[in-house]
Amino acid sequence: TGSSRKSATNSVLWHMGDEIPAIPNKKEGGFCFGGKIAPIFYNTLEDSGAFPVECDVSKLEMGQEIIFEPFKGQITDAKTNELLCEFKLKTEVLLDEVRANGRIPLIIGRQLTDKTREVLGLEPTDIFRRPNQNDTSKKGYTLAQKMVGKACGVEGVRPGDYCEPRMSTAVSYTHLT
């Protein structure tokens, strides 16, 4: 994560986030509503456990009490029950990312769960939402797409695909003479 975008995200979280126990001057969680959230900030908010939502914010006002319904994709005024806006989540996985307090903890937890179940001879669990892969293209992959795909355990990746690299231990030996 770049320090400038992390700093900008931390500034936003400072006003809306929750204190992190035993970590001074840092917050997590919260919600961020925006008409358009730049991808670099959207991803950093996801990493921080915040809930970024792109929606029409023209009817939202400072200090207004709202009812946020992520499963319905609606924000309503708490006092009048007026529908303020509707939205669609970029991915259903965002719900798990918020529950896990960030994208990185979710990835780690999901991979540990998957590997443990595999070792125990159990089927993959359905407690996690999985990203949808929409690859219906018959085109081949570029070398870069194949390289990333190999790291993720698939043939290749396309723009917009979600993939997680398979991690293992790396050892480096340095000989002193």
Predicted feature descriptions by range:
Residues 1-76, 81-86:
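Feature captures the catalytic cores and cofactor-binding loops of soluble hydro-lyases/lyases
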Residues 83-97:
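C-terminal binding/interaction regions
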Residues 105, 109-152:
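Flexible inter-domain linker/hinge segments
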Residues 155-160:
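N-terminal glycine-rich anion-binding loops that anchor highly charged ligand groups
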Residues 165-168:
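Short glycine-rich or small-residue beta-strand-to-loop segments that form or flank ligand, phosphate
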Residues 174-177:
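Conserved small/polar residues in nucleotide/adenosyl-binding loops
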